[in-house]
Amino acid sequence: MPKMKPIMIAAALTLATIGSVPADAGSPKPNAQAAYAAARIWGYEANIEATLGLCREMDSANAVAYDRLYHAFVTATAPTMARVYAILTEESIRSGMPPDTATKRLDPSMPRLVAKQTADANPTLFIEEQCRLGIGHEAEIGRLLAAVLPDDIKLIESWH
């Protein structure tokens, strides 16, 4: 799958204020590390979804295979992504901001843009290395987040 640096940087920058605003004394303290981990996971997950969508468009002969991969990925990551959104919402509140502050700053068009730029640079290579290598690996794609971002997954799993 594509490198995530631009997405991770953008996600981190959008959450820079989490933890910088003091919360009420009686409420839990903000956990910026958890918010950053959640944002990185969101960015990686969004990039996989965008890549699979672009694969479906560019390699339409294998559209059904990409649909299976997408379904397997979204199904497997749904609990993690629910936790990601819960963390981003709660950490915004703990930082004294409206609940949707962090989630509103995660730009869903960015992953598509990154995938599109990668594909435009070399369409044949994109299809061969980013798309077709995933075909038939529905079981593995569900474990991708934990394999690529193990520390972030551990951090959000231990968040409270």
Where are these regions (language model features)?
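Compact alpha-helical subdomains of small soluble proteins
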Residues: Y70-H160
